[in-house]
C-alpha cells in the first residue's frame, strides 16, 4: 500500500461502506493474501473461499485498526486466523500430531533449535509445493512458526494444543520437508 495517508483514505472509505474503497483494498491485497491462504489450505477453491471469508472479517473489523502497526500484518493475521478456523472446522483434531509422539522433549527442543531450512536458496514455488505436501497439523505449525514468526506459546494458544505438541509438529514438519526436498532434488539430478 503506497503510503499511510492513502491507506487511511481507503480504510476510511471502507468503514463508510464505499464499494470503490473496498474494491481498491481488496485488489491491493488479494494476491499476497491468497498466497498466505495457499500455505494453509491445499485446495485452490477452498483457499479462495477462506480468503473471501477473511476479507469479510477484515472489512467488519476495519474500524478497529488504529494505524499504529503494519496494516498488511494486521490483515495477514486475520487471514491466517480464518484459515486456521477453516482447518479446525473441517477436521476433528487437526493440530495434534498425526502419529503418536514418542519424542522426548529434549530431542524435540534440540531439533527445533537446529538451523532453519535454507528456503531463501529455493525458488518460492518449490518451497510452497513441498510445504503443501505436509499434513495439515505439520503445515500449519510450520507456517505459523517459520513464515509468520509466531512463538510456540502463541501457536499453542491459537490452536488449542500444548507447546510440546507445537515443537514436535515443527520438528516433524522439518524432517518431512527435508525428506520431500531430498527426494525432489534426487529426482531432478537423475
Segments the model singles out, each with a brief description of its role:
Residues 35, 49-56, 69-81:
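Structural recognition of an alpha-helix C-terminal capping motif at a helix-to-coil junction
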Residues 26-44, 61, 131, 180-183:
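Amphipathic, Lys/Arg- and hydrophobic-enriched alpha-helical face
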Residues 11-35:
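A short, charge-rich alpha-helical start-of-domain segment used by transcription regulators
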Residues 4, 93-119, 151:
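Internal acidic/polar
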Residues 88, 134, 139, 171-190:
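Short, Lys/Arg-enriched C-terminal cap helix and immediately downstream tail that follows
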Residues 15-16, 52-70, 89-91:
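Sigma70-family region 2
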Residues 141-145:
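A short pre-motif secondary-structure segment
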Residues 63-67, 77-98, 172:
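Arg/Lys-rich amphipathic alpha helix in sigma70-family domain 2
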Amino acid at each position: 500500500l503506497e503510503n499511510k495517508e492513502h491507506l487511511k483514505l481507503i480504510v476510511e472509505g471502507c468503514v463508510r461502506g464505499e464499494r470503490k474503497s473496498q474494491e481498491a483494498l481488496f485488489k491491493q491485497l488479494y494476491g499476497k493474501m491468497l498466497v498466505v491462504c495457499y500455505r494453509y489450505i491445499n485446495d485452490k477453491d477452498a483457499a479462495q473461499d477462506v480468503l473471501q471469508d477473511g476479507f469479510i472479517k477484515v472489512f467488519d473489523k476495519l474500524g478497529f485498526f488504529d494505524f499504529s502497526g503494519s496494516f498488511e500484518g494486521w490483515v495477514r493475521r486475520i487471514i491466517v486466523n480464518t484459515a486456521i478456523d477453516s482447518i479446525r472446522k473441517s477436521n476433528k483434531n487437526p493440530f495434534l500430531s498425526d502419529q503418536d509422539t514418542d519424542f522426548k522433549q529434549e530431542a524435540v527442543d534440540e531439533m527445533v533449535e537446529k538451523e532453519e531450512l535454507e528456503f531463501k536458496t529455493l525458488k518460492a514455488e518449490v518451497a510452497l509445493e513441498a510445504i503443501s505436501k505436509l499434513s495439515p497439523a505439520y503445515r500449519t505449525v510450520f507456517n505459523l512458526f517459520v513464515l509468520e514468526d509466531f512463538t510456540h506459546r502463541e501457536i499453542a494458544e491459537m490452536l488449542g494444543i500444548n507447546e510440546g505438541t507445537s515443537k514436535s509438529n515443527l520438528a516433524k514438519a522439518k524432517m518431512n520437508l527435508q525428506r520431500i526436498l531430498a527426494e525432489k532434488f534426487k529426482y531432478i539430478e537423475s
